[in-house]
Amino acid sequence: IEVVMGGKEGYLLDKSNGCKRSCFFGSTSWCNTECKSKSAEKGYCAWPSCYCYGFSDDSKMWDLKTNKC
């Protein structure tokens, strides 16, 4: 039996400014590490921002409704 923990996905939030966490082409491994450090299962660079999969349900992600950029 496989248990799926957290299924939210979205852009990684830069808490310092409320924007999406920026990235450049070729920085997928960096985004993957950053996403995992914020409780996501994996991530990649969806230029120009890091996109993460498998956030836990209580994780904070970038949200268009509260966008401050």
Swiss-Prot record:
Its main location: secreted. One of its GO terms (molecular function) is toxin activity. One of its GO terms (biological process) is defense response. Expressed by the venom gland. InterPro entries: LCN-type_CS_alpha_beta_dom (IPR044062), Scorpion_toxin-like (IPR003614), Scorpion_toxin-like_sf (IPR036574), Scorpion_toxinL (IPR018218), Scorpion_toxinL/defensin (IPR002061). SUPFAM superfamilies: Scorpion toxin-like (SSF57095). It is found in: Secreted. Keywords: Disulfide bond, Ion channel impairing toxin, Neurotoxin, Secreted, Signal, Toxin, Voltage-gated sodium channel impairing toxin. Disulfide bonds join 19-69, 23-45, 31-50, 35-52. Pfam families: Toxin_3. Residues 8-69 form the LCN-type CS-alpha/beta domain. GO terms for cellular component: extracellular region. It comes from the Eukaryota. PROSITE patterns: LCN_CSAB. Residues 1-7 form the signal peptide. Has the structural arrangement of an alpha-helix connected to antiparallel beta-sheets by disulfide bonds (CS-alpha/beta). Negative results: does not affect the cardiac Nav1.5/SCN5A, the peripheral nerve channel Nav1.7/SCN9A, and the voltage-dependent potassium channel Kv1.5/KCNA5. Beta toxins bind voltage-independently at site-4 of sodium channels (Nav) and shift the voltage of activation toward more negative potentials thereby affecting sodium channel activation and promoting spontaneous and repetitive firing. Belongs to the long (4 C-C) scorpion toxin superfamily. Sodium channel inhibitor family. Beta subfamily. This is Toxin Tz2. It comes from Tityus zulianus.
